[in-house]
Amino acid sequence: MRSVWILVVLGFLTSAGGIRAAEITDAAGNRLPRPFEVRHVVCSGPGCLRLLIYLQAQDRVVAVDDIEKRRTRFDARPYALAHPQLSSMPMFGEFRGYDNPELILALNPAPEVIFKTYPGLGHDPAKLQQKTGIPVIVLDYGDFGSRRPSLYQSLRTMGEVLGKEQRAERVIRFWEETIADLAARTGNIPPGGRKRCFVGGIALKGPHGFQSTEPEYPPFGFVQALNVARQPGSPSGAVSVAKEKIVAWDPDILFLDLSTLQTGEEAGGRHELEEDPAYQVLSAVRRGAVYGLLPYSWYSHNFGSILANAYFIGKILYPERFGDVDPAAKADEIYSFLVGKPVFETMNQAFQGLVYRQIPLK
């Protein structure tokens, strides 16, 4: 009977034939020798396939969840745009981790490993492993904030399983160097020189209007922007704030997450800024200081878009500190490293050419 084990990898040995586990630990705490090669995998859960592609291991994928089969006018997932072949692969289940064990068992070639993010969503990892007999490795997707160590550990774990340890370290180093560059450009801005900003239209499991924001919006933090929605006790994720608060804050500059365009011409953040009398009193609206950003929360965090947005925001807030930066070119530099192709213009066209530009309002 196959032993149930989830996370796992205490050590790996590299051989000419691939990667084999020197030791694993099962769910009961048993340490078992179990050599194997990992040439075929599936990635379950938001962002899981993104991490695999960051590691340049897309050739190991044997099936995808149903979100990868969809093609819509709007798509802000650079990894999917850079690798359209994923959409023609077999399907193993529904998105957000709702895996189908029967479909997984029917795959040919069969996966040796299932990677899974957000284990609380969809199919329980232990039950999935019991039903399929395939090891399920749970990954903490983390973020660019306080959970950055978890993100890095997940990349390293995935890298060890796939024999992509060096690539995992390169990705981590790239992120750290990019974040350090942003800090070097803006770290000495005095508190009184920080611009007051607000970002609206933040997506959360779908598009939202202008009141949807994020108090801990990562790009603001990377360039020392003063996020007016960041108040004592504010949650870290997306929240909807009262319109009256936005008016009272009266930010110097407004940014719009362009995922809000999915709501259509008669709804969403841009429409609200144009038509809602409450927003007409905002000084940023009157001055035309409203700018479009790439959506970054699209089947979990797009880490490349977070960094690209930070460079654009920095250039708008402190142009003298970002004079050498072309935001579109910088975005493509980031995407080329992370997903293998420059996909900025593809996304810009999908979002009406409004990415990294002043948004015209009626």
Predicted regions span which residues?
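Bacterial N-terminal signal peptides
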Residues: W5-S15
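Extracytoplasmic substrate-binding proteins
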Residues: A21-I24, R31, D124-G206, A229-R230, ...
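Conserved H-X4-D acyltransferase segment
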Residues: A28-Q56, A203, H301-N302
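Structural recognition of the beta-strand scaffold that forms the well-ordered cores
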Residues: V42-S44, V62-D65, E112-T117, V136-D140, ...
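A short, structured surface patch at a secondary-structure boundary
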Residues: C43-G45, L49-N108, E112-P119, V228
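Solvent-exposed loop/turn segments at secondary-structure junctions
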Residues: G47-R50, I67-R70, Y118-G122, G142-S146, ...
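Alpha-helical, coiled-coil/dimerization segments enriched in small aliphatic residues
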Residues: H208-G237
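Pocket-lining segment of extracytoplasmic ligand-binding domains
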Residues: V228-Y279
